[in-house]
Amino acid sequence: MQPPYIQERLKSLNDIETQLCSMLQEASQVTFIFGELKRGNESVKPQFENHVKQFYERLDKSTTQLRKEIQLLDENVGTRLLPINVNKKALGQDTEKMEEQLDLLSAILDPSKSK
């Protein structure tokens, strides 16, 4: 089981993620209703304004909370959290895999040019 501090941070990050997903839903609604407004449907203007307002409120709240989490992380590196030393062990494998996938895609799109 994680220490309480880590559990709190994970819960907070989960809440931020939920808010960001909700914000994306609002953005989707804004886009849809904007299309309706462009078609001349003026009756949806109050909904458009409401969704835009909700989008910006959620954006503000989630960025504020994320900034707080980043600040807490900065303050606790070296005290509650150990500094992490990352060593790359699989150098070049990501490039090889990408090239392999691009070759497969090329073969699918144009079989005459396959290697």
Swiss-Prot record:
Pfam families registered for this protein in UniProt: Med11
Coiled-coil ranges from the UniProt annotation: 56-107
InterPro entries: Mediator_Med11 (IPR019404)
One function term, GO molecular function aspect: transcription coactivator activity
A Gene Ontology BP annotation from the UniProt entry: negative regulation of transcription by RNA polymerase II
Phenotype when changing L24K: Results in a decrease of TFIIK and RNA polymerase II occupancies at active promoters
Domain of life: Eukaryota
Principal location: nucleus
Outcome of substituting G92S: Impairs interaction with SRB4/MED17
A cellular component term, taken from the record's GO annotations: mediator complex
Keywords of this entry: Activator, Coiled coil, Nucleus, Transcription, Transcription regulation
Compartment(s) where it occurs, according to its Swiss-Prot or TrEMBL record: Nucleus
Assembly behavior: Component of the Mediator complex, which is composed of at least 21 subunits that form three structurally distinct submodules. The Mediator head module contains MED6, MED8, MED11, SRB4/MED17, SRB5/MED18, ROX3/MED19, SRB2/MED20 and SRB6/MED22, the middle module contains MED1, MED4, NUT1/MED5, MED7, CSE2/MED9, NUT2/MED10, SRB7/MED21 and SOH1/MED31, and the tail module contains MED2, PGD1/MED3, RGR1/MED14, GAL11/MED15 and SIN4/MED16. The head and the middle modules interact directly with RNA polymerase II, whereas the elongated tail module interacts with gene-specific regulatory proteins.
Chain's role: Component of the Mediator complex, a coactivator involved in the regulated transcription of nearly all RNA polymerase II-dependent genes. Mediator functions as a bridge to convey information from gene-specific regulatory proteins to the basal RNA polymerase II transcription machinery. The Mediator complex, having a compact conformation in its free form, is recruited to promoters by direct interactions with regulatory proteins and serves for the assembly of a functional pre-initiation complex (PIC) with RNA polymerase II and the general transcription factors.
Family that this chain belongs to: Belongs to the mediator complex subunit 11 family.
Additional free-text comment from the UniProt record: Present with 396 molecules/cell in log phase SD medium.
Protein name, per record: Mediator of RNA polymerase II transcription subunit 11
